[in-house]
Structure formats: C-alpha cells, structure tokens
C-alpha cells in the first residue's frame, strides 16, 4: 500500500468518524481525540491531516456537499422536474431511522454551525443552500414563478419531518411527510 493510499484512507476515516460523532453528540462537545479513536488513527496523526478542529469540520461540510451534489446529479438523470423533486423527497427517507434517533445529520450540523462566527458559521448554509438552489431550478422548469418559495417549502417539509421524527422517536413521520410532499409536487406540476 502506498503512502498516498494510506493517507487518503486515514483522512477519509477521520472524516467519517467526525461525521458520525458530530451527528450523535454535536460538533462542539466532540474532541479530536474521540474522532481519532473512532477512526482508529493515533491522536497525534489527526493534526497531520487537519491543523485545527475547524479544518475537520470544514472537511465534513465538504463531504456532505459532495454527497448532496452526487445525489442531485443522479436525480438530474430523471426525465422531468416533478420526478426529480419527488426523488429528492424519497432520498431523505434513507436517513429516517437515523433522524428518529439523533436528528437529521445535515439539518443538525447546519443548525449547530449557524451559531458559529465567520466562515464556519456560513459553511452549514452551503449544504442546504445547494439543495435549495437545485429544487428552485426544478420548480422553475415546471414554470413556477414562485419557485424559490416552493423550494423553501419543500426543504422545510423535509427538515421539519426530520425534526418531528427525532422529537417523537418515530421514523414513520418522515415517510408520511414524503408521501404528502409527493402529492403536493404532483398538484404543482
């Protein structure tokens, strides 16, 4: 195994561990030592990849953005905007059980980072911002002048259902909301 492959693997493990811990216990309470332990990386090696905790947080945000862009790219392969929007809604069901237990991984991170100052405070908005911009473009393709408002309503419905699923420890809230949102999308197209 080359040094580059080992480095990439350790870096990816650190990001994956941070994602999980940030979701389960929050960014601020999570220590770099906990991330290192979960990633099975010596604690001192964390600083080789990330000079500060903020750098690791930024890497987690970038990872979420990459996943979002990949998901949206897959949805763009569908033939028209309504199925794409419904696909976005259904895609969130993949995290329904997780959301019921710990809240939405993306929504929770965005809410927590929003309380930070500077670049880190703005970083969380990038994740949901990309998804909202994409949804707005889909509604525009449906000929809707209120596309921005509709995109916000869609994301509010998705994120709101994740919050309620967590509050009531009931993943079915998200699946019921997804069905409602799909009917709503049909009524708009």
Locations of regions flagged by a protein language model:
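Amphipathic alpha-helical segments used for helix-helix packing
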Residues: 98-122
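Helix-turn-helix
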Residues: 2, 13, 17-55, 59
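Hydrophobic alpha-helical connector segments
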Residues: 59, 73-102, 151-154
């Amino acid at each position: 195994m080359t040094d580059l492959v080992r480095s990439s693997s350790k870096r990816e493990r650190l990001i994956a561990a941070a994602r999980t811990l940030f979701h389960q216990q929050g960014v601020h309470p999570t220590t770099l030592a906990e991330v290192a332990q979960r990633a099975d990386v010596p604690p001192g090696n964390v600083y080789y990849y990330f000079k500060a905790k903020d750098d690791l947080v930024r890497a987690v945000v970038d990872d979420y953005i990459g996943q979002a862009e990949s998901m949206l790219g897959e949805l763009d392969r569908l033939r028209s905007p309504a199925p794409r929007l419904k696909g976005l809604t259904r895609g969130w069901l993949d995290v329904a059980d997780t959301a019921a237990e710990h809240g939405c991984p993306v929504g929770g991170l965005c809410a927590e980072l929003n309380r930070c100052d500077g670049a880190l405070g703005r970083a969380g908005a990038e994740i949901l911002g990309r998804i909202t911009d994409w949804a707005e473009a889909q509604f525009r393709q449906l000929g809707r002048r209120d596309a921005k408002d509709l995109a916000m309503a869609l994301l509010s419905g998705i994120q709101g259902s994740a919050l309620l699923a967590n509050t009531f420890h009931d993943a079915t809230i998200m699946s019921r909301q997804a069905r409602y949102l799909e009917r709503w999308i049909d009524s708009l197209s």
